[in-house]
């Protein structure tokens, strides 16, 4: 009889443990800032920025950009300019963007690769209406998940769904037909600067961008040829 009772209680115990686990996981941290407010304030901050350091990673077997990795500095004042290292077509090359033209170091010298827009218009990243600020403004169903440290900055992870139109505009190359899962890491205190953003364009395919040194002066010289 005791064995029967014990066997009967096992499913009940398992269910109770499962429910307890779910309750703990689903419970929001009351100390985290409200997600919608974080997104709104971060979007407002990002909209005013004119320079940043970028680490971009594109993963998956269906690339949404013509490059897979990029590390560099970007400014939009007095004009769009950038410098760093990018990986495209299996090659990792130092690059410079000046006056709308892309230069890549092939060997010991830089060569013109033509208009930067033919690869990716880097100016879109900080465009007040089409760039990161617009991505943040177009995340819905947002939830503050937890605090993580991104490049030494305490950041709140916000999850939600991003508008397909916002990302299509941002990348200049994707043709998404449905909204997609998105994550944004936003500085917990201060002006709520964006520290990282990630979107899943399709299963197994992700665009992730980490950002730092907001507002730091960036000087880019046109390379000699």
UniProtKB/Swiss-Prot annotation:
Induction / repression: Part of the lrpG-MAB_2807 operon.
Signal peptide: 1-21
GO BP, sorted A to Z: lipid transport; response to antibiotic
Highest taxon above the source species: Bacteria
Recorded topology in the membrane: Lipid-anchor
Lipid tethering residues (N-palmitoyl cysteine): 22
Record's comment on post-translational modification: Modified by Lgt on Cys-22 with an S-linked diacylglyceral, signal peptide is removed by LspA, Cys-22 is further modifed with a fatty acid on its amino group by Lnt yielding a triacylated protein.
GO molecular function terms noted in the UniProt entry: lipid binding
GO cellular component, one term: plasma membrane
Compartment(s): Cell inner membrane
Disulfide partners: none
Recorded phenotype for the gene knockout or disruption: A double lprG-mfs deletion strain is more sensitive to the antibiotics tetracyline, vancomycin, rifabutin, clofazimine, novobiocin and ofloxacin.
Swiss-Prot/TrEMBL keywords: Antibiotic resistance, Cell inner membrane, Cell membrane, Lipid transport, Lipid-binding, Lipoprotein, Membrane, Palmitate, Signal, Transport
S-diacylglycerol cysteine: lipidated positions: 22
Entry-linked Pfam families: LppX_LprAFG
Function: Helps membrane protein MAB_2807 (P55) transport triacylglycerides (TAG) across the inner cell membrane into the periplasm and probably ultimately to the outer membrane. Binds TAG in its hydrophobic cavity and transfers it between lipid bilayers. TAG probably regulates lipid metabolism and growth regulation and plays a structural role in the outer membrane. Also binds mannosides, lipoarabinomannan and lipomannan and various glycolipids in the same cavity.
Similarity comment text for this entry: Belongs to the LppX/LprAFG lipoprotein family.
Domain remark in the UniProt entry: Forms a U-shaped beta-half-barrel with a small hydrophobic cavity able to hold a triacylated lipid or triacylglyceride. A flexible lid region may move to accommodate different TAG molecules.
Extra information: Bacterial LAM blocks host cell phagosome-lysosome fusion and is one way in which Mycobacteria evade the host immune system.
Protein name, as recorded: Lipoarabinomannan carrier protein LprG
Annotated source species: Mycobacteroides abscessus (strain ATCC 19977 / DSM 44196 / CCUG 20993 / CIP 104536 / JCM 13569 / NCTC 13031 / TMC 1543 / L948)
Designated gene of the protein: lprG
């Amino acid at each position: 009889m005791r064995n029967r009772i014990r066997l009967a209680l096992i499913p009940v115990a398992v269910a109770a443990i499962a429910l307890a686990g779910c309750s703990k996981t689903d419970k929001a941290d009351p100390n985290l800032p409200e997600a919608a407010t974080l997104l709104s304030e971060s979007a407002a901050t990002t909209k005013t920025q004119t320079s940043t350091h970028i680490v971009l990673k594109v993963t998956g077997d269906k690339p949404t950009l013509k490059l897979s990795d990029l590390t560099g500095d970007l400014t939009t004042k007095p004009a769009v300019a950038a410098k760093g290292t990018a990986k495209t077509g299996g090659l990792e090359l130092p690059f410079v963007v000046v006056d709308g033209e892309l230069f890549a170091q092939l060997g010991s010298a830089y060569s013109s690769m033509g208009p930067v827009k033919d690869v990716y218009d880097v100016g879109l990243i900080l465009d007040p209406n089409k760039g990161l600020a617009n991505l943040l403004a177009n995340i819905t169903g947002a939830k503050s998940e937890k605090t993580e440290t991104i490049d030494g900055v305490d950041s709140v992870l916000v999850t939600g769904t991003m508008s397909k139109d916002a990302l299509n505009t941002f990348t200049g190359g994707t043709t998404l037909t449905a909204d997609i899962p998105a994550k944004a890491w936003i500085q917990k205190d201060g002006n709520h600067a964006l520290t990282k953003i990630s979107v899943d364009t399709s299963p197994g395919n992700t665009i992730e961008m980490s950002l730092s040194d907001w507002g730091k002066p960036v000087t880019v010289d046109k390379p000699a040829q």
